[in-house]
Amino acid sequence: MEPIKNLPRLCRTLGYEFKNIELLTQALTHRSAANKHNERLEFLGDSILSIVISDALYHQFPKATEGDLSRMRATLVRGDTLTLIAKAFKLGDYLFLGPGELKSGGFRRESILADAVEAIIGAIYLDSDLEVCRKLLLHWYAERLAEIQPGVNQKDAKTLLQEYLQGLKKPLPDYQVINIEGDAHDQTFTVECRIDDLSESVIGVASSRRKAEQIAAAQVLELLKK
């Protein structure tokens, strides 16, 4: 857990300086850690993200159908995309978690990371206004919005990675579960993904094997773009 004195560093990473730093602290606080947690901010941020991305897609693709717009929005706001954004910001280093969540690796769990991104969006909105949120989110999403196309990038990460490697006539990815933690009703899966083009495996952590594989595949795709 990152000491609070480092929150200004996170602000620089986010590209936003909070007037009320307590809003950011709350956005990073999981319900396991305190009564004043981030779930209400997450609710707010989810709605703001949806309207900003919907508006951006509507104007970017004037001829796209409602179905294509909905699928593109779903791709951009779904949990694995938010998890990648959280990892880029290193949010796991700043989360405030209860002892149980901390011990079970909650700072890596995809749902907690994705929820924290939405909570931060809600906190920024309360600290500023919708227009500030819009500009910041469009900056965060600039590369993804530039790449997305109607009917193209709506496949999940595992499918996209498989098709990419098949197109190059390369071996398919190898996914292995390397760790399972927690009780049967609340497990955390750690999966590694290996491909020939990367010297080291990439790790995905999630509440199910399938989700962990998707997160690992998405990170491999990000690395292959570089």
UniProtKB/Swiss-Prot annotation:
UniProt EC number: 3.1.26.3
Record keywords: Cytoplasm, Endonuclease, Hydrolase, Magnesium, Metal-binding, mRNA processing, Nuclease, RNA-binding, rRNA processing, rRNA-binding, tRNA processing
GO biological process: mRNA processing; regulation of gene expression; rRNA processing; tRNA processing
Main location class: cytoplasm
Catalysed reactions listed for this entry: Endonucleolytic cleavage to 5'-phosphomonoester
UniProt GO cellular component terms: cytoplasm
Signal peptide positions on this chain: none
Superkingdom, taxonomy of origin: Bacteria
Active site: 46, 118
Molecular-function annotations in GO: double-stranded RNA binding; metal ion binding; ribonuclease III activity; rRNA binding
Domain annotation DRBM: ranges: 156-226
Subcellular location: Cytoplasm
Binding site for Mg(2+): 42, 115, 118
The UniProt record lists the keyword Membrane: no
Family: Belongs to the ribonuclease III family.
Summary of the function given for this chain in its UniProt record: Digests double-stranded RNA. Involved in the processing of primary rRNA transcript to yield the immediate precursors to the large and small rRNAs (23S and 16S). Processes some mRNAs, and tRNAs when they are encoded in the rRNA operon. Processes pre-crRNA and tracrRNA of type II CRISPR loci if present in the organism.
Protein name in the entry: Ribonuclease 3
Gene behind this protein: rnc
